Amino acid sequence: MPFRHLYVFGSTVAQSERLMLGGACDLVWDKGQVGLGDLTLPWGPQHEMILFGMYVPSKQNREDGRGALSARLRAGSVLRVDRPNSRGVKAHPTEKPVELMRRLVESSSGIDDVVLDMFAGSGSTLVAAILSGRKAIGAEVAAEHYETALARCVAAEGLWRAGQEAY
C-alpha cells in the first residue's frame, strides 16, 4: 500500500489541512538537551515538532513487521532520543539520530516495505530503513550530503547483511 504514513519535521497538525490526511497527530522529539534558539529568551528549545499523517491505516504487526495489529503500534507522542553531537561530529546541520528515525520507520512500515525520504540529508532515515529490513529510496540535492548519505547506506547495508548471516 503506497503512502501509508507521512512524517514532517517542524510541522504540526494545525499546518496540515491542505494535505487532506485520513488522520494526523503531533509528535514531539525531546532532544535531551537545550539548543541555542533565541538567546534573548529565558527558555531554550529542547524539542522539535513532528507531524504524523496517515492516509491508510496499517494492519501489520509491529513486533516483527508482519501479521495482525499489535499493541506496539500505539506509543506515546513524545520521543526521547538525544540529538547528534553538535561539535563538528554531525554530517548535516539538521541531522536526525538513526535511533529516532528507526522508531518512526518501524512504526509505519513492515519488513521489505519501501521507505522514501525526499530530503535525505545525511541519510539517517535511509540507514534506519536498511537496518530495519526495509528498502530505502532517498533524494538529496546537495552533492556533499548525497555522498555522505550514500556512504552511510553502503555501510548500513553491510551491517544488515552481516546481521542476517548471523541467524
Give the location of each predicted region.
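Class I S-adenosyl-L-methionine-dependent methyltransferase module
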Residues: 154-167
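Conserved SAM-binding loop
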Residues: 149-150
